[in-house]
Amino acid sequence: MICLKVKVNPIPYLLAVAMASNIGSACTFIGNPQNVLIGSLSQVPAGEYFLSAAPISFLGLIMLYLAISFKYKNDLLVSFEYKSDNNSIIHKYLLSKTIIVLALVIIFYLVGFDLSLTASFGAAFLLINARIKPERVYEDIDFNLLIMFIGLFIIIAGVEKSGLLDLINSFLPPEYMKEIPLFSVMAIVLSNIVSNVPAVLLLRYYIPVDEQILWQALALLSTIAGNLTVFGSIANLIVIEIAKKQGIKVTSNQYLKIGFPLTILLSIISIIWFEFIN
């Protein structure tokens, strides 16, 4: 919206939002849906994972900034002036309540409470006590996106019941899956075929609960892999859908020119990090 108002090319900003949300969310267990799932399935402490993933995540954000600045340097050098809409309504009371509830959810999760329960109670509290009618909240739900993911989860359930995983196991013995490079490649490829959340649902069967380093690698690499293609993560799809509603088309080619080399390079660094350094 802001880019359209000031008449600048919105593509670099949209790419930055989508890719930065993937890279930034990789450093915690509450940053995205697949990491929440991994946090609940594994025995990895949230603080330990943050210390392990944060350096890669911060490095990735720097690399993203440099890549977009180089690719779109002419578009980003354009000067503009933006005047905010004075008629915009800010619910200060609701904003303060939301910040407090969010902080409490994070604190409860860090001390050991189940994230899904604390987040659900927090959301229910805000929905009940908000001065905004629930109907207005429901209007902003992207049901098309939800239906698409429901379909993906149904496909994953079909794969689980079909015996395909047993067939894969016959070609790839479990001890091979403990090799970080091979496991990382599988996570990256699967994340861009069925998206990262369904990929985690499939790959969880190959990781013993006590293999903390593999859980950490899966959380970090399945999220970073979301930047490889447009279909790699839900964040990409949300950004593209919102842009489309504003008449802006983000093409796969535009995304690949930044996302593909960035993801490959950052994935190699991540594998080296987990294999030799961390």
Where are these regions (language model features)?
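Transmembrane helix-bundle signature of multi-pass membrane transporters/permeases
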Residues: 1, 15-25, 53-58, 154, ...
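Hydrophobic transmembrane alpha-helices that form the pore/transport pathway of multi-pass ion
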Residues: 1-26, 37, 200-220, 250, ...
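Juxtamembrane and boundary regions of transmembrane helices in multi-pass small-molecule transporters
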Residues: 6-11, 47-90, 100, 228-278
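Small-residue-rich segments of transmembrane alpha-helices in multi-pass membrane proteins
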Residues: 16-28, 85-94, 145-159, 215, ...
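Hydrophobic core segments of alpha-helical transmembrane domains in multi-pass membrane transport
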Residues: 21-24, 58-70, 97-111, 122-130, ...
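Structural signature of hydrophobic alpha-helical transmembrane segments
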Residues: 27, 53-61, 113-123, 220-235
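Transmembrane helix boundary and interhelical junction motifs in multipass membrane proteins
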Residues: 29-35, 117, 192-203, 230-238
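Transmembrane helical segments that form the transport core of multi-pass membrane transport proteins
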Residues: 101-213
